[in-house]
Amino acid sequence: MFWLALAAMAAISPLQYGYAALLAKEAASLTLLAVWIACQAAGALPALHLVRRGRLGVRACLAAGAALSGLGLAAAAFPAGWPITLIGYALLGGLGAGLVYGACAEVVAAWYPERPAGRVGLITGAFGYGAAPLLLWAGIDPSATSAAFLVAAVLAAGVIGIAARHLRLPPALWWPGDVDPRSHALDAARLRTTPEPARQFRLAQALRTRTLPALALILTCAGAVSVFDVIVVAGTGSWSAVAVLVALNGAGRSVAMRCSEVFGRRHVLAAVLTALAAGQLLLATAVTAATGAGVLLWAGVVFAGLGGGAFYPLIASLVRELFGAERAGEIHAVVYSAKALAGAGAVALALLALSAPASALLAAAALAALPALATPRLRIPGLPATIPL
């Protein structure tokens, strides 16, 4: 189950990161990217909701995702005018990626109830680094861009189609046989770093707290900077740096989740956002430096890559930690839908970078630094203010 979901996530990665690096170079294509991100973020919410309630089977959801994702990549491979690309890539491709993302996350979280956030973090990492081979191929040989996207379309349709055939939800109240539920529930080390919520929140209750909008704002700011980094690093022409950036974007997610189990979600999220902000400052220095620009570029890529994707699974795990596990999927889907605003923010930064790249990177640094400062102040909703959690 896990490896099929991971492969499906990797297959949709070129739709976001491949397009952002290779094709988002002017206002029209940047607008298409923003629409795609909005559709992908919005598509994940109903997909997860319908799959969780049994109104849409995992097979049907992923089969539709396979067809639409393949269509979106094919539309990117052979652009036939802005309106057609808008429908094929941005609208249908974005919806297809959202279906795959939502279904795979729900299936993996259900099969691994003892460590749902860590496992989901691993498969969302594939959504980051899955585009690295395409970026290297098309980056080294720009004339092969259409062929690379066409191959990605065929692979996406095939891989997600196979996942649709085999992925399924576990039985109700599933728990793995090799994990003692009592020992897991009373694990002092786990409770110290991931405290239990005050109660199990329903979606309507979570929407009335201050914590949920704060998480959505953090995701919006960090998500905008993450996508913007792919665009701005691709503009340097260093395709090895772009590939490393997206690879670290994915790998950093699993590393951050491991660290969060030791140091706590909020502390690691603050560190991740700080690294993302530091990456922007290094990249801004690189684009203005007369000497040493290469070293600064690579340092910026490392920091921006490690911070540019890790916040996604950390926010997902914080939703579970703060609001409870019963409706965590629905609540996180609402938070994740804020990625639609992140896409618009990324495009705004990219448009600014066309004329003033250093200023755009400094603005991105501020956009990442503000939530980094606010993250340690996140509190468990429902507890009295005198309790320091």
Positions of PLM-derived features:
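C-terminal transmembrane helical hairpin of 12-TM major facilitator-type secondary transporters
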Residues: 219, 243-318
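Intracellular juxtamembrane helix-capping segments at the cytosolic ends
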Residues: 98-112, 119, 310-323
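Hydrophobic core of transmembrane alpha-helices in multi-pass small-molecule transporters
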Residues: 10, 84-99, 220, 295-310
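C-terminal ends and interior cores of transmembrane alpha-helices
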Residues: 13, 67-80, 275-291
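Extracytoplasmic gate region of multi-pass secondary transporters
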Residues: 19-24, 201-257
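Symmetry-related core transmembrane helices of the 12-TM Major Facilitator Superfamily/SLC fold
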Residues: 146-166, 359-377
